[in-house]
Design a protein with these regions (language model features):
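C-terminal accessory helical subdomains adjacent to catalytic cores in phosphodiester-
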Residues: 2, 6-18, 33-57, 75-87, ...
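Conserved beta-strand elements of the Class I
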Residues: 20-24
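Conserved residues at beta->alpha junctions
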Residues: 25-26, 90
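Phosphate/oxyanion-binding active-site loops and adjacent basic polyanion-contact surfaces
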Residues: 27, 31, 59-68, 204-208
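Alpha-helical scaffolding within the catalytic cores
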Residues: 69-74
Length: 220
């Protein structure tokens, strides 16, 4: 991790007036690949995106509580300005309501923290670039939400659907640029799914990653 002095020097020299967006995610590669590509596509001198990576010792620790700890550690080490943002990007499918509630409560109590949760997982956000989930039958929407494997050897349903739509998909290697050309559609579709935006996270099929995408694109 960069020293406090090097980060402050970077901000002073290259991003003097930039709003800092720091992203920590449950996934090791998927979110990093996507948001690096999005930030490059929407390069703006007033926005600087920094994506945290887990150390080798932390590779298998992806719980929301650990992702939140990454952001808290960052906040303690570096001086943040009033318009900076710390974003927690997590999935719903693997975690208990109690854990998510604790994390959501802590985020709500911190002016810098924002939680972008996908229900069931980040692949929903990626799929929304290519598919309008609101046009699916109730039965298909339920399959998306349940995101089951058809066997032990197959991927979860949304990964298989994403591979069908993209032609090729692996969480550590995929064509993010293909998706980003449709990011405006993804945002509109995610908003349409977000029936109760005041809830702490989507209780049904939905993703709040669109809020982070809008921030990276400087649509605030």
């Amino acid at each position: 991790m960069r020293s406090r002095n090097s980060l402050m020097r970077e901000r002073q020299e290259a991003f003097r007036d930039a709003r800092l967006i720091v992203i920590a995610s449950e996934g090791k590669d998927t979110e990093r690949i996507y948001f690096k590509a999005l930030a490059k596509e929407y390069t703006n001198p007033r926005v600087h995106v920094h994506i945290l990576e887990r150390s080798e010792a932390e590779q298998n620790n992806s719980s929301p509580e650990h992702v939140l700890k990454q952001l808290n550690d960052y906040k303690e080490q570096y001086a943040l300005e009033a318009d900076d943002e710390l974003w927690l990007v997590i999935d719903k499918d693997r975690w208990t309501e109690a854990m998510l509630s604790r994390v959501a409560t802590e985020c709500a109590q911190d002016e810098y923290m924002h939680m972008a949760l996908s229900n069931p997982c980040i692949e929903l956000w990626l799929l929304l670039h290519l598919v309008d989930a609101t046009s699916l039958s109730p039965e298909e929407q339920q399959r998306w939400l349940e995101n089951r494997r058809t066997s032990r050897r197959t991927d979860p349903y949304l990964k298989m659907r994403l591979r069908q739509e993209m032609g090729s998909y692996h969480e550590s290697a995929y064509d993010a640029q293909m998706l980003i050309t449709h990011v405006e559609e993804a945002i509109a579709r995610a908003k349409a799914l977000d029936k109760n935006p005041t809830d702490r996270w989507p209780q049904t099929l939905g993703t709040r990653v669109y809020l982070l995408a809008e921030s990276v694109m400087n649509r605030k």
